[in-house]
């Protein structure tokens, strides 16, 4: 708003279109992985991102900023499912650990990116574009030198994959149920970045205090892994039960936070929320990897990544409408109700076909 002189409504529309670009990128990237392999798919996405970030450095006024942002979302969307599918191919027996490693790496990247972004923006907002380009150049170097691997993955030609077989239909149905659950979880989770963020400011909790919540979130994800391992062992590595536990913890977080009027209660709510995501977020791509028929590993990772992107896009609008129409208390209740529905999807997933993913 400050840099481009556009309304918050226009900003919201641009972000929605950016999310749409990411969804298309997720689905295309997953499909290309199955046809071209991980290295080529990642390079196509990386080149797309390099083009968009380069153009952003020279043309970042209106409407060029919005156009390049959507292109960047599309390119980045292609890369993510390919990386997940490649990780599954490189470490096929890693199960949850494979995707938990990516989850931890993503968290480190988000934390460092936010910190460095704030530091760079102190000098000039324009430097953000240059920093972004430098990061993609570094990523391209890593991709070119490290990702061109001979992966022992069993790819099948697309016309040899019988998608209409009874078994594959069951797998696809189970995958769609997990995607519905994942999207709902993200609709709820994203409220912490939108409606809850606005609510904290309205009750005189400072931005610095609010940022502490996410600092705690990031630190916990890295250091609290040993705390959830006994629970995972108790669940015998059952991914369905891990999702059940995680969603119940999400619901508890929203219940506790619904009473919050002081920073300490928000902090407790965030700590509870973080434990929930540590169960759910790595379990979903692990399920996608195990459900995917041979030759569709990329497509299934594309499905789950697009589901999370859709949840992130819908969540702010959905939560904002509820708060504007009713109040924050109704929003908290609505999120708990949605998460209860998500539990239903996990239950149906178990009924549909969980034989491929029972133990990790």
Residue ranges of predicted features:
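Juxtamembrane intracellular "pre-TM" segments in multi-pass secondary transporters
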Residues: 148-179
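Paired small-residue
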Residues: 52, 63-71, 264-272
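Helix-to-loop junctions at the C-terminal end of transmembrane segments
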Residues: 25-37, 224-237
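Symmetry-related core transmembrane helices of the 12-TM Major Facilitator Superfamily/SLC fold
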Residues: 128-145, 332-348
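Helix-loop-helix hairpin linking two adjacent transmembrane segments in secondary transporters
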Residues: 102-144
